[in-house]
Swiss-Prot record:
It comes from Helicobacter pylori (strain HPAG1). NCBIfam families: PRK08475.1. One of its GO terms (cellular component) is plasma membrane. F-type ATPases have 2 components, F(1) - the catalytic core - and F(0) - the membrane proton channel. F(1) has five subunits: alpha(3), beta(3), gamma(1), delta(1), epsilon(1). F(0) has three main subunits: a(1), b(2) and c(10-14). The alpha and beta chains form an alternating ring which encloses part of the gamma chain. F(1) is attached to F(0) by a central stalk formed by the gamma and epsilon chains, while a peripheral stalk is formed by the delta and b chains. Pfam families: ATP-synt_B (PF00430). Keywords: ATP synthesis, Cell inner membrane, Cell membrane, CF(0), Hydrogen ion transport, Ion transport, Membrane, Transmembrane, Transmembrane helix, Transport. It is found in: Cell inner membrane. This is ATP synthase subunit b. The gene is atpF.
Length: 171
């Protein structure tokens, strides 16, 4: 079949030469064409099986490599899916960790705010208590110094009951 196609193709290529009106008898184109066709046929006869086997082996080689590449591609796609799942899980875990950390930070902040508030209230109470003690101490010292001055001046006389009443009223 191939040989027939070659001969027809060759004749089609030679058809313009026949139409030109040249004298073909003085050229050896027909002999050369027949020699070429004979040479091509002999080459085809001897090399066809080897060429076919070579082309089949190359085709099988290419098919095997294609299958290997497709297998690698499939493995790569599976790995990609696996890694994407792991990435999603890692993102979810990170979000969970962040939300837990925010909750914990809020709880710790509230705890320290409450502790600080209680400490401030205790400091205020203690300072008020200290101020009250200091005020009482100063009043007592003032009253004592006034009584001492009054006793020493001897212009005013007090008995013990009057002193006790004055001290009770003032302190």
């Amino acid at each position: 079949m191939f040989l027939v196609k070659m001969v027809l193709g060759f004749l089609i290529l030679l058809s313009p030469l026949c139409a030109t009106g040249l004298d073909v008898s003085q050229t050896d184109i027909i002999e050369r064409s027949l020699n070429f066709l004979l040479f091509a046929g002999i080459l085809w006869y001897f090399l066809a099986k080897k060429l076919r086997s070579f082309l089949r082996s190359k085709s099988l080689e290419i098919s095997k490599r294609l299958e290997e590449i497709q297998a690698q591609l499939k493995v790569s796609k599976e790995n990609k899916k696996k890694l994407l799942k792991e990435l999603e899980q890692a993102k979810e875990k990170a979000e969970l960790i962040i939300s837990d950390a925010n909750k914990e930070a809020y709880t710790i902040t509230q705890k320290y705010e409450l502790q600080t508030k209680m400490d401030v209230e205790n400091l205020i109470k203690n300072s008020k208590a200290l101020m009250d003690l200091e005020v009482k101490k100063i009043k007592r010292e003032l009253v004592e110094s006034v009584f001492k001055d009054l006793r020493e001046s001897k212009k005013v006389s007090f008995n013990v009951q009057d002193c006790v009443n004055i001290l009770k009223q003032r302190l």
